[in-house]
């Protein structure tokens, strides 16, 4: 066990985690040059296209160190984006140390900070590494000082490397062996293994990625899942080199996979503990705290025949993505679907894209909302995640909106723009500290404003240099209203939205104007209205298409023309009373883009 090292790589988006992990795999000979491709561990198409890591992946490598010993390095690549922080905390729970990778040109960013503090709270050894020293903009000395100032760990001797060119990679490996402590565990005791991740394989059932804390697990053991009490015989055990390599046994301190032919999708929940039936551990390992969804949106299949497939797809996806929450919902406009909870907007986009790609579904999404706390006049307190579930306005005593604490790191020259943006988003400044050229700001901003487009606008006002990390702190009373959209005097529940009263009128006006361009014209006028309760705050009309019924009258008597026009008018009136309007998917998405063009 003294030769095992378990570690993760934590870093901000685009600081070179995946490239560094490629280089480590290559150096230790995990894959031959022919099999090597860039971003080996980003196995999903979406990860490659967007250039981001979404899922944590694990690899076991053998490293022949300079002291003549061979070390087993188990490392877990983690995502850097703020929406996938939950994946990071799970990966860190399985490790004794973490490599903190910082771009020597960009310096410390907010997400680096957040993940680094998570690692420190778990008492992990944090090893700083300055990456991308081959870039002309790199300034490793300044960045090393930044790490000391902002994070407070000693970075004077930090390894300087370039994952792209391979410079300094052997130093990184030596540093891992030297600084990160070996795991401690009892080899002979009862088995305790933590499930870091699970996914569903059509042939093998549930595949679980586990970290064995105590004891050992081998093929043929009767494995018991502690939360459900289910017992299954172990079929395969091994680790990833990144390819699956069967070893038949995993001992304390090791990270690998276990397949026990579990066909039930919820058979091995993430964060659970595995033990062996008959020689059981006394208690389960402390799991992870569940990530609470911050954003909710309705997902509906375009054709109602896909509902069953959609339900199965969500079940399979949720085993792999433990932070996804869903429950059935039905809408008068869109039929049956699910209300899903996500960690943020990027998470929502990724989930929708994975469902459409991997399961071949066609989906409509409604506008995302956050959870509001509503106190009714009867004194009940409700948590509401959908505008459709809001009680009538006169039954509401008080609405409280969730407030997020946002930590923003921004270079001094963009400070003014960022402060202006935070004020527009109804933010309250609580702290501001200067660290060299960087400024650390802390704001309390309503979660509803943060999840809509705050991240995008923060990036554009600061030319991409500002970085953001946020978490929920409290509910606070606010003057919120529900804006309903009426099409031909009928409410469309899927388009309702909750917003602050001060912005509601301009919001309603923008929305109906935008929808006017998206709804196809009919043979009769379509009235689009935005309303708060029974008060109409904005209106716009989709003009009718008119057929020229007088085309075949040459000259002739005026009464003949009047008769034809009257007949047309009656026909339109009848049509309007029975005609219904199809709303295209773009109209539902229009809600997301209000205010972006300003």
UniProtKB/Swiss-Prot annotation:
Species of provenance: Psychromonas ingrahamii (strain DSM 17664 / CCUG 51855 / 37)
Physiological role: Required for accurate and efficient protein synthesis under certain stress conditions. May act as a fidelity factor of the translation reaction, by catalyzing a one-codon backward translocation of tRNAs on improperly translocated ribosomes. Back-translocation proceeds from a post-translocation (POST) complex to a pre-translocation (PRE) complex, thus giving elongation factor G a second chance to translocate the tRNAs correctly. Binds to ribosomes in a GTP-dependent manner.
Family: Belongs to the TRAFAC class translation factor GTPase superfamily. Classic translation factor GTPase family. LepA subfamily.
UniProt-recorded name of the protein: Elongation factor 4
One cellular-component annotation, GO: plasma membrane
Enzyme nomenclature, EC number: 3.6.5.n1
Catalytic activity: GTP + H2O = GDP + phosphate + H(+)
Ranges for domain tr-type G: 2-184
Highest taxon above the source species: Bacteria
InterPro entries associated with the record: EF-4, EFG_III/V, EFG_V-like, EFTu-like_2, G_TR_CS, LepA_C_sf, LepA_CTD, LepA_IV
């Amino acid at each position: 066990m003294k030769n095992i090292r378990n570690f993760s790589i934590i870093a901000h988006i685009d600081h070179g985690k995946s490239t560094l992990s490629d280089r480590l795999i290559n150096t230790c000979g995990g894959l031959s040059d022919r099999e090597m491709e860039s971003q080996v561990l980003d196995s999903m198409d979406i990860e490659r296209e967007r250039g981001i890591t979404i899922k944590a992946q694990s690899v076991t490598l053998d490293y022949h160190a300079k002291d003549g010993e061979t070390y087993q390095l188990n490392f877990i690549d983690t995502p850097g984006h703020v929406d996938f922080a939950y994946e990071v905390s799970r990966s860190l729970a399985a490790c004794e140390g973490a490599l903190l990778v910082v771009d020597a040109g960009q310096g410390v960013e907010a997400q680096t900070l957040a993940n680094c503090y998570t690692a420190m709270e778990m008492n992990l050894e944090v090893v700083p590494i300055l990456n991308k020293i081959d870039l002309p903009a790199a300034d490793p000395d300044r960045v090393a000082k930044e790490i000391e100032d902002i994070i407070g760990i000693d970075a004077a001797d930090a390894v300087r490397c370039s994952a792209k060119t391979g410079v300094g990679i052997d130093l990184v490996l030596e540093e891992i062996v030297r600084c990160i402590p070996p795991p401690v565990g009892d080899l002979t005791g009862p088995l305790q293994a933590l499930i870091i991740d699970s996914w569903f394989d059509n042939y093998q059932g549930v595949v679980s990625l586990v970290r064995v804390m105590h004891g050992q697990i081998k093929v043929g053991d009767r494995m018991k899942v502690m939360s459900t009490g289910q017992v299954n015989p172990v079929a395969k055990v091994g680790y990833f080199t990144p390819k699956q390599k069967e070893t038949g046994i995993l001992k304390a301190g090791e990270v690998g996979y276990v397949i026990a032919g579990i066909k039930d999708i919820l058979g091995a929940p993430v964060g659970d503990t595995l033990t062996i039936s008959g020689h059981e551990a006394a208690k389960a390992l402390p799991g992870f705290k569940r990530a609470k969804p911050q954003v909710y949106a309705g997902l509906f299949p375009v054709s109602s025949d896909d509902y069953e497939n959609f339900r199965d797809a969500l079940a399979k996806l949720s085993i792999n993505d433990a932070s996804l929450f869903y429950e059935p919902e039905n809408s008068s406009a869109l039929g049956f679907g699910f209300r899903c909870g996500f960690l943020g907007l990027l998470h929502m986009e990724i989930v929708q894209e994975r469902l459409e790609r991997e399961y071949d579904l066609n989906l409509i999404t409604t506008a995302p909302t956050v959870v509001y706390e509503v106190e009714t006049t009867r004194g009940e307190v409700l948590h509401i995640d959908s505008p459709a579930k809001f009680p009538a306005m006169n039954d509401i005593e008080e609405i409280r909106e969730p407030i997020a604490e946002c930590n923003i790191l921004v270079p001094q020259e963009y400070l003014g723009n960022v402060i202006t943006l935070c004020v527009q988003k109804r933010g309250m400044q609580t702290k501001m500290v200067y660290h060299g050229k960087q400024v650390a700001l802390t704001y309390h901003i309503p979660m509803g404003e943060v999840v809509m487009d705050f991240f995008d606008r923060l990036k554009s006002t600061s030319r991409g240099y500002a970085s953001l990390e946020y978490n929920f702190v409290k509910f606070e009373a606010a003057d919120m209203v529900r804006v309903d959209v009426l099409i031909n005097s009928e409410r469309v529940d899927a388009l309702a939205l909750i917003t602050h009263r001060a912005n509601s009128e301009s919001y309603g006006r923008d929305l109906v104007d935008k929808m006017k361009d998206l709804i196809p014209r009919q043979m009769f006028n379509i009235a689009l209205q935005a309303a708060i309760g029974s008060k109409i705050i904005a209106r716009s009309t989709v003009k009718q298409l008119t057929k020229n019924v007088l085309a075949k009258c040459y000259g002739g008597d005026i009464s003949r023309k009047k008769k034809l026009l009257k007949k047309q008018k009656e026909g339109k009136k009848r049509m309007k009373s029975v005609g219904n309007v199809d709303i295209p998917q773009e109209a539902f998405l229009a809600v997301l883009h209000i205010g972006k063009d300003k």
